[in-house]
């Protein structure tokens, strides 16, 4: 049907060729003799020769090929990079830094993938292409309807083109000479009478078994042939129509056989699938029944367990509520009895108070006064006891620290400090004094605190070094030290005390005099006022003297505060 239409269109287009020319600047165009029309050969029983093959076209640029090659190259490079990343740490760092798309999934596939996974993916892809459904009868009907509509559209377009060609032919006798010169050369077609073309008919054995869609297609072909007969441009070609008729009969028989084969195959597949579906349905029904029975028994057991648990909880709650109500009732009875008893006792007491116990309030006031007196007396006794204990502890500490006996063994001081700390918890001054005293004598013994006599003897031992140090010049070297030692032997000791003397002999004399009189604070002050190397030599002696002064002051403070308590 399509071939006939295209050929008729070509013949209609080949009837005339119009050439036009224009008139420019009012110059008459050259008169060109009209070309001789080609001889029209009557179409008889001979088949026209096939058209010449089209010339080979030069290969053009293909966007699809370019995109395909580019995509293939990018895929190979990307996959090679990810594979190299699994083998090289530097490439892996590059991939992670650049955050290439889908690099984690692809690297995991490269590292953990196997041939079994590839085979499974290939089978899935293969199943997608093999599970192609055969075209159904409805699909075939739809295809034939589309072909029929397309043929009708082509017929309509052909008729329109033929009508336009007839309208375009206009006689040139009515035109002026100028218009005839300006008008293009026209070629008149030679018309011939064409006999009616034979219609397409099916064989008698295929007429009943052919589908309705094929019959409709044949009808449309016959309509098309009749339209060609009605046209004045058609030529007679019986062999072509006969070949078309034969081809249509063959197509009808082929379609009939394909339809029968398709129906038979469809019936066989339907039977097989029905059997398989019935067997699978039976198996699934049995499995579903077993699962339902199992679930039913499981749910039944769970419901029984939950029901028993709920009943036991409700029974326990009821028992607890009943026992609580009973205990509340008993408690209320006891409270009521207690109230009645208290009421009875209060009534009896009021009777006795108004009678024999009339002076009970006065006796109660006297007892309260006695209690207050006893509390005050007890407080005074406790404070006196504390005073006595503090006096004893302070006296013991003074005797051990400030005036120890030569034959006594050294004893730790910490137990006495702990005893004072326990007693002096209520007084803030005592607590602060003991707190300052503890770090001074906690790690000391009874013989580690130097007495005045020991300090005096140490000062006398330190005096020659102080004399030699006073003779040292600034930044003295070894020779200066040797010279100071020699010259210090030549110094004569000063007798008496010079109150205003600032030389080393005056200072040594004042310190010895103060230690002899028991004025340790003045002696420590004189030694602390030394300068230079002499002060560094006397530093240890000053530290020991200050420690003794601090201990004496804190013990005196504790003793004075204990008298005020």
Swiss-Prot record:
Coiled-coil features, chain-numbered ranges: 282-381
Range of the transit peptide: 1-25
InterPro entries: MIC60
One of the record's GO cellular component terms: MICOS complex
Membrane-side (Mitochondrial matrix) residue stretches: 26-62
GO biological process: cristae formation
Topology with respect to the bilayer: Single-pass membrane protein
Location of the region described as Disordered in the Swiss-Prot/TrEMBL record: 34-54
Quaternary structure and partners: Component of the mitochondrial contact site and cristae organizing system (MICOS) complex.
Function of the protein: Component of the MICOS complex, a large protein complex of the mitochondrial inner membrane that plays crucial roles in the maintenance of crista junctions, inner membrane architecture, and formation of contact sites to the outer membrane. Plays a role in keeping cristae membranes connected to the inner boundary membrane. Also promotes protein import via the mitochondrial intermembrane space assembly (MIA) pathway.
Family to which this protein belongs: Belongs to the MICOS complex subunit Mic60 family.
Protein known as: MICOS complex subunit MIC60
Organism: Candida albicans (strain WO-1)
Gene field: MIC60
